[in-house]
């Protein structure tokens, strides 16, 4: 009988070991997928794709008993060779191949050139071959940024005494009303997909004081614009025993600062790949809803048409205004009108036409 203790010794070299000094001029084993092959005749550069990134290997014909023509992009392989320092290679290391074991091979040539820096193909082609297009460096980087944001959200809220919860995504009714609900039959009873975990969060605040969730929400949006999504990952938190709604704004500001710091420190490679310049969250201005409307109307000679909500153009102009005037990348808009806020938004006791809420 065998008992497992949670440890497993692998002969494959770790990424950290490949990057370190200990394996220089030593034999190492690398596993991954062949991302690209550059055949120079007697020498070929075989780029191996791993979860950490791309690693350059070098195949010299006279050093091996097989041909470069035996290798294909998309193969998964186990490579044995000697690690050398090479400043021109990605990460300053390369592995000189001595042996290659093919673990799997594509049945036919890849329909997408995933080794290119950017996938120059249609959205339809990307989705039709999604399991392949996701292997492109830029496509992978987007998922790492998503990981960074959810990781930062969890870590920051854990550090601030929050409890993570997991709420149902099928319910009898929506949390925010309206017609943008995905309706379905739940064992012959009407049901909807969750728009928001709002009511569950409020329920659990009575249990744990501070709760959060990262999970999918669904909106049956009938508009095909960049402002509308039918499904997305929502980062939600709820906290009790607050002195002011501004305490929530402070918590959100702290999270944004934490997330930007994590992205800079642990995801610099992905930011570079995507050519992303991080916004500044060090100081975020807050402006009342009615004041924001007046500022935009005056600055950009724009008439206020809807006194109860922000039009898309107004939202863009508010961002533009605070960038121009204060070099701010974020802005809080507070005190939305009671008429446009859900019933659980607290009225401002000094003027019940407005709420103690923000976006």
Predicted feature locations:
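Short, highly charged C-terminal tails/helix-capping segments
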Residues: 269-282, 286
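A translation/RNA-centric and nucleic-acid-associated enzymatic feature enriched
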Residues: 180-261, 282-359
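Cytochrome P450 heme-thiolate monooxygenase catalytic core
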Residues: 164-166, 271-273, 333
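Short coil/loop linkers at secondary-structure junctions
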Residues: 163, 266, 299-303
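Flexible helix-coil linker/hinge segments at domain or subdomain boundaries
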Residues: 258-271
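Class II aminoacyl-tRNA synthetase-like tRNA-binding/catalytic domains
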Residues: 2-242
């Amino acid at each position: 009988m065998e008992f497992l203790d949670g440890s497993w010794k692998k002969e494959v070299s770790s990424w950290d070991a490949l990057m370190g000094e200990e394996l220089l001029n030593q034999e190492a084993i690398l596993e991954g997928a062949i991302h690209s092959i550059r055949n120079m005749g007697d020498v070929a550069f075989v780029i191996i794709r791993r979860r950490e990134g791309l690693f350059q290997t070098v195949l010299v014909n006279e050093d091996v008993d097989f041909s470069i023509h035996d290798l294909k992009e998309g193969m998964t392989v186990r490579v044995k060779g000697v690690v050398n320092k090479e400043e021109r290679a990605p990460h300053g290391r390369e592995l000189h191949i001595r042996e290659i074991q093919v673990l799997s091979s594509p049945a036919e040539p890849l329909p997408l050139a995933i080794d290119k820096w950017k996938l120059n193909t249609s959205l339809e082609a990307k989705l039709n071959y999604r399991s392949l297009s996701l292997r492109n460096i830029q496509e992978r980087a987007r998922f790492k940024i998503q990981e960074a944001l959810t990781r930062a959200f969890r870590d920051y809220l854990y550090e601030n005494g929050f409890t993570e919860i997991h709420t149902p995504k099928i319910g009898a009714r929506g949390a925010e009303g309206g017609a943008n609900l995905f309706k379905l039959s739940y064992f012959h009873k009407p049901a909807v997909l969750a728009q928001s975990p709002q009511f569950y969060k409020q329920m659990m605040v009575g249990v744990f004081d501070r709760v959060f969730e990262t999970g999918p929400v669904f909106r049956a949006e009938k508009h095909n614009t960049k402002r509308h999504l039918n499904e997305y990952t929502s980062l939600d938190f709820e906290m009790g025993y607050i002195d002011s709604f501004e305490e929530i704004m402070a918590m959100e500001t702290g999270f944004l600062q934490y997330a930007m710091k994590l992205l800079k420190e642990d995801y610099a490679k992905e930011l570079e790949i995507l050519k992303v310049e991080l916004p500044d969250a060090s100081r975020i201005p807050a402006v009342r809803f009615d004041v924001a409307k007046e500022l935009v109307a005056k600055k950009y000679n724009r008439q206020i048409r809807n006194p109860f909500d922000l039009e898309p153009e107004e939202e863009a102009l508010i961002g533009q205004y605070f960038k121009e005037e204060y070099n701010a990348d974020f802005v809080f808009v507070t005190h939305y009108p009671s008429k446009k806020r859900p019933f659980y938004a607290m009225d401002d006791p000094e003027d019940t036409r407005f709420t103690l809420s923000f976006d």
